[in-house]
């Protein structure tokens, strides 16, 4: 593993702060992450944001094949050269934004393992994208800023509890693997990073249109986080008034003056059921 600073200096490049680029520079940490991903020679792997290849190279040596999606054209060029230098031929490198990548077309229904060191500015968006594509995912081993992982596992009523918490807890289990300090990266980030394993449930209470409606309700509730649920549900995407929202909350046995961050996943399911049952009436 070539030190990221050396690779960048050789190409007269700098990490792009606006893309949240902090490259893993410790080979032991990279091997640990790849090992925890449980990759075998039968597995297809998706790597999100491979950067300079810290995870790509050891993962590709274990996998059947690996698809790496990198937004930064400069890094894609450097990584291609590194793969050639290592004589690695089972990597497909795609220069694209992962948020614009169609995973169904890319993998055609095959189960995949997902790995990646995710920049903070798109971490939540990537997780929501993975939730939408979870039918493809065998498991995911991902690295985020520690703060983001605490939001995923937060409990109702806490400051960190939000839309991401509810959605992830509804459809997955998340396990901490390791915390990585700033000195293991180049350039050094200002905060600690955490590696987590995400395993999506085989089945969930809802699917298809019904699940999309649940997610819509959760998003609406948190869109006006400081307001009571009666007010946060009114208007916006749900297009109901405060009288109707109060009635729906009463049906769901939820106090209308509570706020979004106090509801459990089960309570959001009840709220969604109540809204869904009224959705075709003149009141909604």
Swiss-Prot record:
UniProt cross-references to CDD domains, sorted A to Z: AdoMet_MTases
SMART domains reported for this sequence: rADc
Compartments in which it is found: Cytoplasm
Keyword annotations from UniProtKB, A to Z: Cytoplasm, Methyltransferase, RNA-binding, rRNA processing, S-adenosyl-L-methionine, Transferase
EC number: 2.1.1.182
GO molecular function: 16S rRNA (adenine(1518)-N(6)/adenine(1519)-N(6))-dimethyltransferase activity; RNA binding
InterPro entries: KsgA/Erm, rRNA_Ade_diMease-like_C, rRNA_Ade_Mease_Trfase_CS, rRNA_Ade_methylase_Trfase_N, rRNA_adenine_dimethylase, SAM-dependent_MTases_sf
Class of this enzyme: transferase
PANTHER family the UniProt entry points to: DIMETHYLADENOSINE TRANSFERASE, DIMETHYLADENOSINE TRANSFERASE-RELATED
Biological role stated in the UniProt entry: Specifically dimethylates two adjacent adenosines (A1518 and A1519) in the loop of a conserved hairpin near the 3'-end of 16S rRNA in the 30S particle. May play a critical role in biogenesis of 30S subunits.
Protein name: Ribosomal RNA small subunit methyltransferase A
Organism: Desulforapulum autotrophicum (strain ATCC 43914 / DSM 3382 / VKM B-1955 / HRM2)
């Amino acid at each position: 593993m070539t030190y990221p600073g050396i690779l960048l200096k050789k190409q007269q490049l700098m990490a792009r702060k606006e893309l949240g680029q902090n490259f893993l520079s410790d080979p032991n940490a990279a091997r640990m992450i790849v090992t925890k991903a449980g990759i075998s020679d039968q597995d297809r792997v998706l790597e999100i944001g491979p950067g300079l290849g810290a995870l790509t190279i050891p993962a590709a040596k274990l996998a059947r094949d690996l698809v790496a999606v990198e937004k930064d054209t400069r890094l894609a060029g450097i990584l291609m050269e590194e793969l050639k230098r290592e004589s690695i031929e089972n990597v497909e490198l795609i220069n694209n934004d992962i948020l614009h990548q169609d995973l169904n077309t890319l993998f055609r229904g095959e189960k995949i393992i997902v790995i990646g060191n995710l920049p903070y500015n798109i971490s939540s968006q990537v997780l929501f994208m993975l939730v939408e594509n979870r039918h493809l995912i065998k498991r995911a081993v991902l690295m985020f800023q520690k703060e983001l992982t605490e939001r995923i596992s937060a409990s109702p009523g806490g400051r960190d509890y939000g839309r991401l918490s509810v959605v992830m807890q509804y459809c997955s289990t998340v396990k901490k693997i390791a915390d990585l300090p700033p000195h293991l990266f180049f350039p050094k980030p200002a905060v600690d990073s955490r590696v987590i394993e995400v395993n999506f449930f085989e089945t969930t209470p809802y699917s298809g249109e019904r699940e999309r409606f649940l997610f819509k309700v959760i998003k609406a509730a948190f869109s006006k986080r400081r307001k009571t649920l009666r007010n946060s549900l009114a208007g916006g995407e749900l297009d109901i008034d405060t009288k109707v929202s109060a009635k729906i909350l009463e049906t769901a046995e939820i106090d209308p003056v509570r706020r979004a961050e106090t509801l459990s996943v089960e309570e959001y399911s009840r709220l969604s059921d109540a809204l869904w049952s009224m959705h075709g009436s003149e009141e909604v």
